Amino acid sequence: MSLVYMNIMTAFMVSLAGLLMYRSHLMSSLLCLEGMMLSLFVMATLTILNSHFTLASMMPIILLVFAACEAALGLSLLVMVSNTYGTDYVQNLNLLQC
């Protein structure tokens, strides 16, 4: 495995660890999710380019579309929560609280 793939996998793992550790604020969770999606996009693009598998060349673009949709929904949820509660804590999203 080359050094580039190791760096991308390390970036994914760091983003995943950040998502698991810093999940109190919605903004930090969204940033970690974006880091994960970016590393997945780069990994998929490099894998397809190195394997010369042209049939799957649309997969990174589809992944990028899903990342853009996730970012738009996450930011709209962040605006809604910050307007309603005044903070961006993830605990405000719990619908089971009394």
Curated annotation (Swiss-Prot):
The cellular location(s) given in this protein's UniProt record come to:
Mitochondrion inner membrane
Question: What GO molecular functions are on record for this protein?
Answer: NADH dehydrogenase (ubiquinone) activity
Record-level GO BP terms: ATP synthesis coupled electron transport
Q: Which InterPro entries match?
A: NADH_UbQ_OxRdtase_chain4L/K, NUOK/Mnh_C1-like
**Where is it chiefly localized?**
mitochondrion
User: A Pfam family this protein belongs to?
Assistant: Oxidored_q2
Q: What reactions does this protein catalyze?
A: a ubiquinone + NADH + 5 H(+)(in) = a ubiquinol + NAD(+) + 4 H(+)(out)
**Is the Iron keyword given for this protein?**
no
Q: Can you tell which superkingdom this protein's organism belongs to?
A: Eukaryota
TM region positions: 1-21, 29-49, 61-81
> EC number(s) on record?
7.1.1.2
**Topology relative to the membrane, per the entry?**
Multi-pass membrane protein
Q: Which GO terms describe its cellular component?
A: mitochondrial inner membrane; respiratory chain complex I
Alphabetical keyword list: Electron transport, Membrane, Mitochondrion, Mitochondrion inner membrane, NAD, Respiratory chain, Translocase, Transmembrane, Transmembrane helix, Transport, Ubiquinone
Function per UniProt: Core subunit of the mitochondrial membrane respiratory chain NADH dehydrogenase (Complex I) which catalyzes electron transfer from NADH through the respiratory chain, using ubiquinone as an electron acceptor. Part of the enzyme membrane arm which is embedded in the lipid bilayer and involved in proton translocation.
Q: Which family does it belong to?
A: Belongs to the complex I subunit 4L family.
Subunit structure as annotated in this protein's UniProt entry: Core subunit of respiratory chain NADH dehydrogenase (Complex I) which is composed of 45 different subunits.
This chain's protein is named NADH-ubiquinone oxidoreductase chain 4L
